[in-house]
Amino acid sequence: EQALTVPLLAGSGIVCPPVFEIRTFFENLARFRPTWYSAGFSHHSAILDAAGDYPKIVENNNLRYIRSGSGRLDPRVIVGLETTFGVPVIEGLGMSEVPCVTCNPLPPAKRKPGTVGIALDGNVEIMDDRGQLLGPNSEGQIVVRGSMVFEGYLEDPAATAAALVDGWYHTGDLGCLDDEGYLTIVGRIKELINRGGEKIRPGEVEVALMQHSDVKEAAAFPFPH
C-alpha cells in the first residue's frame, strides 16, 4: 500500500503493470526511468537472472535504490542486484494487516543485510508462547502494536480475536530483534516441521541448501510419510 500512496503524496508518478513480466519490467525501466522499484523476492531473482539480456537498459538505469518487502531475500540476490544496478537494496517487512512493519534505513544510516530493518512506527516486539515479551536476541513470534495496525477482519470476529490480543497483532512470523532493534525473520509458526519431537525451521534447511553453488532456489516443507 505504501508503495502506491507515498509517491502520490510526494507528487511522484507510479508505474503499476497489471502483471509481472520480465520484458515489460525492463521496457518500463527504460521508458519511465523510475528512481526506485519495489518487488517480492521471487521477482528480484527473476530480474537479476534476466539483467544480462538488457545490458544497455541496466547500464543507463536511473534507480536510486531497490526495495524488497515480501520476505527475506537471499543474500546472494542482494549482492547481485547491488552489483548489477549499482544501488542499495532496502529490505523491509509488511503485510496486509500492517502495511509497513520494519525497514532498513537508506545509506548512510546503518543497513544490516539479512535483517528487515527497524520499526518505522509503533512497537515491534518478540513474544513467547505464554504471551510474555522477550528481550534482544531471543526467538519468538513477531508482534506489532500501533496506529498502523488494522482494526480487524471484515465480518470475522473469531479471526480478529485470534490475531489481535491486548492490542498486539500476532503476525505468525518467527523472528528475533538484536540489541539495536534490527529484526530478523527466521520462519513461520505454521511452517515448523516436527521431526521426532524436534522443531525444524524450513528456512534453516533452505539457507543450508542455498550455500551450494549449484543450487539456484530451494524450498523446504513437511511431507507425511
Feature map (PLM): residue ranges:
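Conserved coil-to-alpha-helix start sites within the AMP-binding
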Residues: 1-9
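Hydrophobic alpha-helical segments, especially N-terminal targeting/anchoring helices
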Residues: 67, 127-128, 136, 171, ...
